[in-house]
C-alpha cells in the first residue's frame, strides 16, 4: 500500500505557494510483475473499479490492471457521461440503482471530485403511446423504490423552455405531450471517474500497467493460468490465479483467445459536441422516439448523442448517416442550436448482447471472469460493475445483484430483455 496526498482546500492553498509543483503523481505507473493473484484486463472505469473494490472490500493485495493504451482512453473517455437508474425490470433497476447510489458518495470515498451533477434525466413523450409506455415505466420504477415523476407538457416546458413545442401557426413536427424525469439522474465527469478509481486503487497497492496489451492466455488442464502480453514493445507472460476481462467492445475478441464464444456484437456508438454557449439546457434530455439526447457540459458545450450504427464495427469513428439523423433531430427539437458549429465527433465501441443486459461473473472457462455486455449503459454502471465483479473474483460466486446476469442465462432462456427501458440506442 502506498501513501497518497489528501486532496483538500487546505492542501490546495498550501500547494499554491510552490506553484502547485509539489503534488505527487495521482497513481504509480507500475512495471508488471511475473505473478498476480488477479489480473484485470482493461484500464477503463470498470477495470479500475474492480481493482479498487477487490482490494478495499475483499483485502486482495496482489492485483494488476493491464491497459493496452492509457488509463480511461477507451469507452470511459468516449461516452456522454450520463448516470441514471431509470430501468424497467426489477433486476436491472436494482443493479443500476446500486450504481447510482455508489456514484452519489464516490467523490467523498475516492477523495476525488467526479463532478457529479444530478440535474435530472428527462425523457420526452411525443404521442399517446409514448405517454402510456412512460407511465408504465415510471410506475415500475416507483415500485422498485426508484424516484420517477410523470410530467405533462406544461411541466416539461417549465423545465426546458427551449424545446420546440410549436404553436397554432406552426405546429411542432414532433409534439411534446409530456414525459417523465428521474431527478437524481444527471452526469459525472468521465475522466475524473477513471482517475479517481486509479488513484484510490494505486494507494491500496494495485499495479496499474499502461501500454500493456494482452495478446493471449495460457492455460493448464483447461484453466486460465495467465496472460501473454506486449508491454512497451516487449513480449512477455504474466501468471495469475484469476483473470477478468473488462474491455467493453473487445470482449468477444479476447474471450475467443481463451476458447470462449460470447453472444456479443460490437457496434460504434458516436457522439459529438458543439462550441460552448451560455446555459441552454437544464437537464439531460432524451427523445427515444427521435433517437437523440442532449446535455450541456460545465464548459458550455452541448453534448449530443444518438443511436448505434447498426453495422458491426471496431472503428472508433462514426459515419455521416447517423450524424445526419441525430443532428436533424437536434435541430427539430432545439431549433435555437441550429447555427452552432460542431467542435468534434467521436465513437466508442459498445458490446451489445441479445437481451440488452450485461454479463458479470464466472465463465465456463475456469479462472476467467467477465464484465461485459453493457452496451450503451457502461458508464452509468461503472461502480456496480466493479463492485459485483470484485465479489465474483474474491469468492468465485456471482454477487446477488449479478445473479440474473450470468452467461448461463443464454442457455436457460432466463433473459432480461431491457431494450424497452435502456434509453436510446438499445
What is each stretch, according to the model?
Residues 52-56, 81-83, 112-120, 218-224, ...:
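Active-site substrate-recognition segment that forms the wall
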Residues 1-38, 53-61, 423:
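Extreme N-terminal leader/targeting segments of oxidoreductases
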Residues 331-426:
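C-terminal catalytic lobe of FAD-dependent flavoproteins
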Amino acid at each position: 500500500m502506498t501513501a497518497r496526498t489528501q486532496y483538500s482546500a487546505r492542501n490546495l492553498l498550501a500547494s499554491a505557494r510552490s506553484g502547485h509543483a509539489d503534488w505527487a503523481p495521482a497513481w504509480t505507473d507500475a512495471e508488471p510483475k511475473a505473478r498476480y493473484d488477479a489480473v484485470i484486463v482493461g484500464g477503463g472505469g470498470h477495470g479500475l473499479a474492480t481493482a479498487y473494490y477487490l482490494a478495499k472490500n475483499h483485502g486482495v493485495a496482489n492485483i494488476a490492471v493491464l491497459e493496452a493504451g492509457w488509463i480511461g482512453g477507451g469507452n470511459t473517455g468516449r461516452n456522454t457521461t450520463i448516470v441514471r437508474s431509470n430501468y424497467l425490470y426489477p433486476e436491472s433497476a436494482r443493479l443500476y440503482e446500486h450504481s447510482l447510489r455508489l456514484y452519489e458518495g464516490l467523490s467523498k470515498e475516492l477523495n476525488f471530485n467526479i463532478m457529479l451533477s444530478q440535474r435530472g434525466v428527462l425523457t420526452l413523450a411525443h404521442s399517446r403511446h409514448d405517454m402510456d409506455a412512460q407511465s408504465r415505466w415510471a410506475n415500475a420504477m416507483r415500485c422498485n423504490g426508484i424516484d420517477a415523476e410523470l410530467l405533462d407538457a406544461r411541466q416539461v416546458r417549465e423545465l426546458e423552455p427551449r424545446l420546440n413545442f410549436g404553436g397554432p401557426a406552426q405546429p411542432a413536427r414532433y409534439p411534446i405531450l409530456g414525459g417523465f424525469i428521474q431527478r437524481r439522474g444527471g452526469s459525472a465527469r468521465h475522466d475524473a471517474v477513471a482517475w479517481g478509481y486509479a488513484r484510490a486503487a494505486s494507494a491500496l497497492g494495485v499495479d496499474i500497467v499502461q501500454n500493456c496489451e494482452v495478446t493471449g492466455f495460457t492455460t493448464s488442464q483447461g484453466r486460465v493460468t495467465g496472460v501473454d502480453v506486449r508491454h512497451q514493445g516487449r513480449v512477455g507472460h504474466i501468471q495469475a490465479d484469476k483473470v477478468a476481462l473488462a474491455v467493453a467492445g473487445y470482449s468477444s475478441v479476447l474471450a475467443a483467445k481463451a476458447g470462449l464464444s460470447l453472444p456479443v456484437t460490437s457496434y460504434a456508438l458516436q457522439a459529438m459536441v458543439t462550441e460552448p454557449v451560455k446555459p441552454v439546457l437544464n437537464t439531460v434530455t432524451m427523445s427515444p422516439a427521435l433517437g437523440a439526447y442532449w446535455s450541456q457540459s460545465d464548459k458550455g458545450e452541448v453534448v449530443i448523442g444518438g443511436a448505434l450504427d447498426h453495422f458491426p464495427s471496431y472503428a472508433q469513428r462514426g459515419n455521416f448517416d447517423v450524424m445526419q439523423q441525430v443532428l436533424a433531430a437536434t435541430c427539430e427539437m432545439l431549433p435555437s442550436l441550429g447555427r452552432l458549429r460542431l467542435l468534434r465527433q467521436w465513437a466508442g465501441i459498445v458490446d451489445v448482447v441479445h437481451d440488452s443486459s450485461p454479463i458479470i461473473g464466472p465463465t465456463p472457462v475456469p479462472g476467467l471472469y467477465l464484465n461485459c455486455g453493457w452496451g450503451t449503459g457502461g458508464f452509468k454502471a461503472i461502480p456496480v460493475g466493479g463492485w459485483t465483479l470484485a465479489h465474483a473474483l474474491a469468492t468465485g460466486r456471482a454477487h446477488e445483484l449479478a445473479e440474473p446476469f450470468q452467461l448461463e442465462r443464454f442457455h436457460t432462456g432466463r433473459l432480461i430483455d431491457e431494450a424497452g427501458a435502456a434509453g436510446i440506442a438499445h
